[in-house]
């Protein structure tokens, strides 16, 4: 007992002696004041709670071996939301256990390693979560974390739910005091990020083209990049002397890009594609790099998304274009079932310089679907091939390659990938249970917008009366995944607009996904009422991507030129749009309009588009209008497929187009019939690059405009000029009569 009292006395004395670590228990807004008193080795413990609308500015100084630590009382127990951000500056600060969830950054990044003009050195952000910290619009750009200063560390953090423009984590080299920084970015989990649809959605960027030849000395290791699909560059290195090692890239639609800068080391990383579209590996630009001992499995991306892409260069290139690849070592790497290893990637009339002095040695390439180990886009006399092993679908006879039966690697499971990476406590909320789907049955005259607003995720709204009248005075706003359909196969229920103020008939808002079947949308102006703006459109401010499926619907009698049947608005993005078996007739505006991004910076409104077995009749605007302007190469979409559609008396004005397709990177127009359409201009106006995969085949052009292609190489199959023989055009049945020439050729709509 005496010994216990003595121990307590000694502890009490130690608590007030100089140099002994202290603990401060405070609320989140009180941290800044506590920092003015705290010193090396002290702990500031923040009470649990939900904190909102705080611009936190933390300055303090610890010491080597005795950092000043600011931590949540319970990891994850301090939740920071609303309009909040964190700025930290000083030296030897350690921030641990905080969760930023569901908020937005008021200005700049969510977390920055600087406060005003003062930067942070030797500071650490650990065991933190930033999840769903997005603005209201996806084109409002900011990052989750920006590193300034030197020798800072970001580790064991989880970064999730980023939907807006902007790099997730940036290493800045804009000043000398942030160069040669020796930052560490390790053991983090970069959780799924969907395709953004333009440049500027990288997961990590180190430097910029202006600092390409400055040494950063940043170490990126032991991170998990899981389905980071924002753009082609998952990790974008734009500086020199960095190390990227032992990371896992899991089903990420993009690459580790050595975009600018020299002498970077890429070693012992694992890339797992599992055959997912656009999964990529390593892209090389500039000089002096080493790419060694990496494992790439099931990577199927092409061109800039290849498993390995060694780029061609621009003569006398400016730093922000493509400098010569030279003096590069690519050794001891394993490629299993990877579809594209490319040398001379990007060769065109600008990028004309092939790589020089590249050593490709002791690599192993296994893919029984290939007959050659690599694709030579340009000459390869600048490569030295030595001691490589291959197991292909045919015997390889190239010098420097030996046919063998190799040992295949064992890959980590998803649980093993996540172990030790990210905040240990973090569990995505994606798996939370939702109520069982319900069906809402509506009769003619019922309040359809109100029913849609009441519906929960996965519900179905059924319009029960065949040919029934369903007037709407405001938009049906879809905020959850929802199906709206007719009850049966009789006459389509008719939705018509009777509002006092113009509005959409259906608006897909944040969180919404729509499947709509068997509905007719009438744009006829009701006496004393306003016109509908669009049949189906999107909210002006959206952050989340959405899907839209339209089947067996009719859009008719929209009588104003700016009023469209289906439209994606600016700064909204659809992952998938499918429009099948539908009729568009008597429209003054466009029928299908995904052309709102007009800044020519590579942005577009929908990634995958399928338009199949649809009829278009008497369309004054463009039946199909899809736009991706500019020459940006950081995305893979849009993918556009138009199959078995019929166009009768469409867009015959001077310089008009039935289809205007600007910048689709994958396009197939097949089995379509153009009749008395595009006479004043084009049936198809296509603006494509030489490397984009476009195909127009098996189409009929009867008394219709020509096909105008930028490259002149878009037509890949036969075209014909046969007069259509429709089943019942007076009742808008534009299928070909059985036995007619076009029916035999399977051109035009089908039953």
Descriptions of predicted regions:
Residues 55-57, 82-87, 101-121, 130-400, ...:
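Glycine- and acidic/polar-rich repeat regions and solenoidal domains
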């Amino acid at each position: 007992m005496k010994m216990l009292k003595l121990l307590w006395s000694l502890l009490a004395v130690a608590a007030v002696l100089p140099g002994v670590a202290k603990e401060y228990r405070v609320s989140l807004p009180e941290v800044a004041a506590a920092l003015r008193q705290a010193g090396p080795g002290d702990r500031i413990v923040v009470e649990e709670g939900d904190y909102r609308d705080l611009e936190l500015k933390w300055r303090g100084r610890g010491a080597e071996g005795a950092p000043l630590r600011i931590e949540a009382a319970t990891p994850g127990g301090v939740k920071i939301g609303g309009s909040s951000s964190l700025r930290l500056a000083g030296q030897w600060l350690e921030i641990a256990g905080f969760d930023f969830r569901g908020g937005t950054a008021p200005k700049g990044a969510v977390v920055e390693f600087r406060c005003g003009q003062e930067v942070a050195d030797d500071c650490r952000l650990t065991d933190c979560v930033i999840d769903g910290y997005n603005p209201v619009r996806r084109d409002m750009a900011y990052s989750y974390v920006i590193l300034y200063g030197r020798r800072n560390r970001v580790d064991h953090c989880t970064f999730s739910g980023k939907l807006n423009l902007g790099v997730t984590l940036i290493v800045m080299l804009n000043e000398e005091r942030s160069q040669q920084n020796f930052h560490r970015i390790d053991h983090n989990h970069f959780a799924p990020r969907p395709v953004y649809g333009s440049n500027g959605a990288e997961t990590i960027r180190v430097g910029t083209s202006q600092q390409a030849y400055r040494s950063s000395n940043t170490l990126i290791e032991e991170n998990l990049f899981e389905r980071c699909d924002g753009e082609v560059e998952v990790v974008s290195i734009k500086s020199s002397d960095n190390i990227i090692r032992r990371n896992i890239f899991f089903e990420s639609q993009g690459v580790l890009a050595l975009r600018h800068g020299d002498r970077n080391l890429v070693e012992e990383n694992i890339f797992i594609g599992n055959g997912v579209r656009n999964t990529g590996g390593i892209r090389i630009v500039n000089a002096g790099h080493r790419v060694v001992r990496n494992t790439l499995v099931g990577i199927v991306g092409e061109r800039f998304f290849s498993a390995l892409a060694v780029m061609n260069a621009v003569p006398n290139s400016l730093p922000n274009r493509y400098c010569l690849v030279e003096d590069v070592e690519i050794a001891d790497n394993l490629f299993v079932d990877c579809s594209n290893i490319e040398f001379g990637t990007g060769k065109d009339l600008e990028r004309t310089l092939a790589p020089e002095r590249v050593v490709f040695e002791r690599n192993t390439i296994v893919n029984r679907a290939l007959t050659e180990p690599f694709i030579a886009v340009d000459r390869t006399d600048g490569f030295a091939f030595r001691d490589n092993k291959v197991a292909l679908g045919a015997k390889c006879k190239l010098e420097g390659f030996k046919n063998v039966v190799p040992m295949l690697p064992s890959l980590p499971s998803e649980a093993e990938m996540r172990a030790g990476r990210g905040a240990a406590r973090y569990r995505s909320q994606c798996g939370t249970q939702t109520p069982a789907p319900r069906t809402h049955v509506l009769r003619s005259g019922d309040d359809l917008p109100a029913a849609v607003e009441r519906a929960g995720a996965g519900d179905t709204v059924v319009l029960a009366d065949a040919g029934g009248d369903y007037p709407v005075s405001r938009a049906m706003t879809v905020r959850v995944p929802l199906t709206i359909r007719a009850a049966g196969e009789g006459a389509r229920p008719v939705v018509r607009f009777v509002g006092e103020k113009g509005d959409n008939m259906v608006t897909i808002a944040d969180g919404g996904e729509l499947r709509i079947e068997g509905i007719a949308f009438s744009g006829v102006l009701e006496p004393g009422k306003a016109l509908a703006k669009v049949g189906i459109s999107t909210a002006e401010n959206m952050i989340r991507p959405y899907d839209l499926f339209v089947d067996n619907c009719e859009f008719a009698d929209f009588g104003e030129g700016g009023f469209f049947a289906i439209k994606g608005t600016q700064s909204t993005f659809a992952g998938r749009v499918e429009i099948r078996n539908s009729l568009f007739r008597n429209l003054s505006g466009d029928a299908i309009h995904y052309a709102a991004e007009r800044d020519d910076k590579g942005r577009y409104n929908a990634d995958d588009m399928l338009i199949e077995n649809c009829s278009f009749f008497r369309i004054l605007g463009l039946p199909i209008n899809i736009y991706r302007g500019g020459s940006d190469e950081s995305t893979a979409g849009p993918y556009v497929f138009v199959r078995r559609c019929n166009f009768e008396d469409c867009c015959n004005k001077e310089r008009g187009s039935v289809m205007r397709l600007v910048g689709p990177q994958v396009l197939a127009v097949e089995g379509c019939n153009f009749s008395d359409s595009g006479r004043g201009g084009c049936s198809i106006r296509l603006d494509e690059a030489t490397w984009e995969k476009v195909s127009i085949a098996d189409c009929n052009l009867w008394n219709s405009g020509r096909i105008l292609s930028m490259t002149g190489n878009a037509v890949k199959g036969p075209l014909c000029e046969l007069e259509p023989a429709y089943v019942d055009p007076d009742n808008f049945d534009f299928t070909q009569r059985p036995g007619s020439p076009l029916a035999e050729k399977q051109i035009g709509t089908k039953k």
